[in-house]
Amino acid sequence: TMAEHNELGKWGEEQAALYLRSKGWYIRHRDWHCGHRDVDIVAIDEDSSIVIFVEVKTRSTGQWGEPDEAIDLEKQNSIIQTAGSYIRNFRLEYCEVRYDTISIVGTPATGAQITHKENAFDLASRFFYREHVRYRRRKRPGNW
């Protein structure tokens, strides 16, 4: 059900936050909203030089592949834009910025299997994709 799905997601974010703390990250915000966009976890390292924006995806089983495969280009774009608002809002322009994903497979009963991908995507990969799409559109006007 949707309620169970949301509960699993909340549990997954909790596991991700605990994991990041254990690695020495300080959790600044969880579920930070800007308009209709949001970012699951914003964390910063101990000397405040790197800020990470983390998208967490949780699935009860791994049978459909890695949970973070669900983070499509549109979602990546949304996270990058939200991060920009966050950085301006909290005056973090001096920080290095990184976009990470954390995939969680499991349930409260089975425990969490955690996969943390650092630098999972960035602005450069987004720009490359946009150029690629524009090129394809010019080549095949009939199909769009």
Question: Language-model features: where?
Answer:
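Conserved catalytic cores of phosphodiester-cleaving nucleases, focusing on short active-site segments
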Residues: 20, 39-43, 48-62, 79
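Acidic-basic catalytic patches of nuclease active cores, encompassing PD-(D/E)XK
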Residues: 1-31, 110
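Catalytic cores of nucleic-acid endonucleases
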Residues: 58-108
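Residues at secondary-structure transition points
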Residues: 3, 7, 11, 36, ...
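Domain-level recognition of nuclease-like catalytic cores that cleave nucleotide substrates
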Residues: 89-144
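Short strand-connecting beta-turns/loops that link adjacent beta-strands
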Residues: 35, 46-48, 109-110
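Short beta-strand or tight-loop elements
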Residues: 23-24, 35-39, 97
